Design a protein with these regions (language model features):
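Rossmann-like flavin
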Residues: 91-205
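Residue-level preference for short coil/turn positions at secondary-structure junctions
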Residues: 4-6, 11, 27, 47-48, ...
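N-terminal Rossmann-like FAD-binding beta1-loop-alpha1 element of flavoenzymes
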Residues: 6-33
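Hydrophobic/aromatic ligand-binding patch that stacks against planar heteroaromatic rings
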Residues: 19, 23, 51, 160
Length: 206
């Protein structure tokens, strides 16, 4: 248990740093926030997607990513790029990454990530009660859609989230267009995460 007369330093004035500092203040601690910029500046928290994603508990290093890596590296528009002269320095990290791609390690991470994310929204709500968020946060959920009718491309993710207890709803073609009538009728399957939220402007929140 920490003494209340301690001064606590929090490094980084992004959304995580600001939230950590505020909760420490609410518990009675004196907090100093360190950053090169003022909160709400131009760092990562101002340029993120603005999603509150309680479903996002599955780590990147998972069994099926191993078969995707070669195609990612060879594609000029792929999401993965390497500076080959840096590869020798990356080998220790990459070996640890591969080790954690096992189903056992992936499920271990997903389980505990879910426990953290499950309490994240109530924690945000506690902070948001103290600031004016008029028109900034939408509680409309988020929908992922695919033109693959049997949803095989996302079967692993769906089953993992089902096992750890994440709230999700499978959608058919009709349900997709009931939720979003303006989407082209080429999508046959989807998943809806009702508890997800988004903000219109991440920078204005903190």
């Amino acid at each position: 248990k920490m003494e209340k007369n301690l001064k606590i330093g929090v490094i980084g004035a992004g959304i995580q740093g600001v939230c950590s500092a505020l909760f420490l203040q609410k518990k009675g601690y004196e907090v100093i926030l360190f950053d090169r910029e003022e909160p709400g500046g131009s760092a990562a928290s101002s340029g993120n997607a603005g999603h509150f994603s309680p479903y996002a508990s599955i780590p990147l290093n998972r069994p099926d990513i191993l078969t995707d890596i070669p195609a990612m590296l060879l594609s000029s528009t792929g999401p993965l790029a390497l500076k080959w002269n840096h590869v020798p320095k990356m080998i220790p990290w990459f070996l640890k990454f591969l080790k954690n791609c096992s189903t056992k390690n992936m499920m271990h991470t997903a389980k505990y990530m879910h426990q953290i994310l499950d309490i994240a929204l109530p924690a945000y709500d506690e902070l948001f009660e103290e600031i004016d968020l008029s028109g900034l946060v939408e509680n409309k959920g988020i929908m992922y859609i695919w033109n693959d009718q049997n949803l095989k491309s996302r079967e692993l993710e769906y089953n993992i989230r089902k096992e750890i207890g994440a709230e999700q709803q499978l959608l058919n073609k009709k349900e997709i267009h009931d939720l979003e009538p303006n989407i082209k009728k080429i999508y046959h399957a989807g998943v809806f995460y009702k508890k997800a939220r988004h903000t219109r402007n991440p920078g204005k929140i903190w």
